[in-house]
Amino acid sequence: MSNVTHQPKIGFVSLGCPKNLVDSERILTELRTEGYDVVPRYDDADMVIVNTCGFIDSAVQESLEAIGEALNENGKVIVTGCLGAKEDQIREVHPKVLEITGPHSYEQVLQHVHHYVPKPKHNPFLSLVPEQGVKLTPRHYAYLKISEGCNHRCTFCIIPSMRGDLVSRPIGDVLSEAKRLVDAGVKEILVISQDTSAYGVDVKHRTGFHNGEPVKTSMVSLCEQLSKLGVWTRLHYVYPYPHVDDVIPLMAEGKILPYLDIPLQHASPRILKLMKRPGSVDRQLARIKQWREICPELTLRSTFIVGFPGETEEDFQMLLDFLKEARLDRVGCFKYSPVEGAGANDLPAQVPEEVKEERWNRFMQLQQQISAERLQEKVGREILVIVDEVDEEGAIGRSMADAPEIDGAVYLNGETNVKPGDIVRVKVENADEYDLWGSRV
């Protein structure tokens, strides 16, 4: 007679941004440590957890559809994440959901799992959970979340109402996690938060400790410390505070990647004021010029919103003029979409959908031309590329100018003598508006 006990199985659906992905990784790590098995199929699972996004209406819809699918396919569902902060909205559509928690409610999620699917008896030494925890990214790169929440009150955003005000992680904890990731083979660390440049503001940049040494809780100190790990370090979601200037020399010295993801959102001072964003375009252009003088290899990524309430053709033209002058490398553009609970919903002069669409097309056409010209400048040069995947046709990787999922790729046709995570030198032979093609040197 077998004495093998049933190992409870959990299904998991993770939606939304990299910050949500990190939350999912933490929950999955705890579940695996406790002896739960994580399975990819609804019908194999004793229960399903759905980690939701609620940032914009399309994300809410996607989350509600994912919850519905999990209920139809499995029946036992726990919901967490940003949309979980709006329990009534979920219950109205899906009253049969077992439990709902808000974002970063790890302990509550685990308690609910224990209630419906009791913890197994298991030997923790047999769980085989890697020291760096369960990761949902490829082994060679990982997201490092340094804080939760945001102190800004941008009128298009409801993140603070879902994730709260800024709470910085202790710098010693952040650096210890980074060290574990590198020890496990990670070659690229992507620093994320709602507002990376505000790291430490909530604790008045107090001094923490790592390996017995004092370290200031600030973005610049964090970058200095991460540079000692000998891997690529990439900064995301950097609000344009003045002290961002202090990380540019670190990029010029090769300590962190010369890559800055800095969401500017618009270029019209009037629209920026309505958004409650910093609004001096001339000052921002001067900073970009100065950054490039200090670090000529700097890649600038940004995101913008067109069709924000009150945006006139004159405002939009200011945005196009800014693009022409700034010549940013990587740009994302969103058509403004009302989000339940956002202050911008109450603003007058909502822009018609057909006008949003027309402006978005003009924006993208201009930026694609700029991007193509910027990438064409790299043809004939040698660059470093981190390999993401390899098949019989060759390898696909990313340059220092390319973050995973959101930027371009470098195609190495016919190159099969590499593996994911390898960093190789490549001569660029061709380019379009997003991607590069080249051969290994």
Swiss-Prot record:
Organism of provenance: Salmonella heidelberg (strain SL476)
Protein's recorded name: Ribosomal protein uS12 methylthiotransferase RimO
Domain Radical SAM core: 136-373
Cofactor annotation: [4Fe-4S] cluster
Catalyzed reactions: L-aspartate(89)-[ribosomal protein uS12]-hydrogen + (sulfur carrier)-SH + AH2 + 2 S-adenosyl-L-methionine = 3-methylsulfanyl-L-aspartate(89)-[ribosomal protein uS12]-hydrogen + (sulfur carrier)-H + 5'-deoxyadenosine + L-methionine + A + S-adenosyl-L-homocysteine + 2 H(+)
Gene name tied to this protein: rimO
Organism placement in taxonomy: Bacteria, Pseudomonadati, Pseudomonadota, Gammaproteobacteria, Enterobacterales
Domain MTTase N-terminal: 8-118
Cofactor, how bound (note): Binds 2 [4Fe-4S] clusters. One cluster is coordinated with 3 cysteines and an exchangeable S-adenosyl-L-methionine.
GO biological process, one term: tRNA modification
PANTHER family: RIBOSOMAL PROTEIN S12 METHYLTHIOTRANSFERASE RIMO (PTHR43837), RIBOSOMAL PROTEIN US12 METHYLTHIOTRANSFERASE RIMO (PTHR43837:SF1)
Function: Catalyzes the methylthiolation of an aspartic acid residue of ribosomal protein uS12.
HAMAP family: MTTase_RimO
Domain TRAM per the UniProt entry, residue ranges: 376-441
Chain positions recorded as [4Fe-4S] cluster 1 binding sites: C17, C53, C82
GO cellular component terms listed in the entry, alphabetical order: cytosol
tRNA-binding among keywords: no
Keyword Transmembrane helix appears in the UniProt entry: no
